[in-house]
Amino acid sequence: MFRKPDGIILPNSGYKNLVVYKKSDVLYQGTVVFCQRFLPPYGDRTVDQMTQAARSCKQNIVEGSSVAATSLETQIKLTNVARASLAELLEDYLDYLKAHGDMEWSIDDTRKNNARDFARSHADWNDWKPVFISCPAETFCNLMIVLIQQCRYLLDRILAWQEQNFKENGGIRERMHTARAENRCENWDKILYSMLELATTPADLESRLATLCEFARRSAESIKNRKGWKR
């Protein structure tokens, strides 16, 4: 269960602490290197499509983290955009493999299992750069596919958490409404108490209490009539 926030603005831990951001940065940097090594420098729209998709994933994670404190709804939308960008990037790498007669590593392939293990424990670009500047295109594509799959898994988990958080805490509008309502209730309690506190005798106290009860009864009837509620 998520703890109800004490204030209207939710805490924000920062995107640079997220493993999914670090992996998305590797995806972006790696895609730039891939395009430089294996795609024509001019006249190929695939270069723009791939780099834009990789950048979109990374930037939407950054923007989603930036708005997390004030708008959970917007954060969820941005996380979905980041995930969709990953799907586009994955398709581009799969298309490259097909176009060049290469294959995606199967789930039982030792190379894929080794790549998964390496990717789980290495989320920094400096760990991947030496590999990407020297490996052949087929290996490059399959490594990127593994990274995309892990990044997508992390985004799915984050998205599930964000949606649950939104259900329990609401957006900023809901939190502001709750804060105003709680403030009104607190002020109303003080007003009622002060009215009763002014009583000079037990009989006066009972009279004041009866007056307040009658006011509450009439107010309730007025609300029922206004809302069209039947008795």
Task: Indicate residue ranges for each PLM-predicted region.
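Amphipathic alpha-helical assembly/interaction segments
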Residues: 1-231
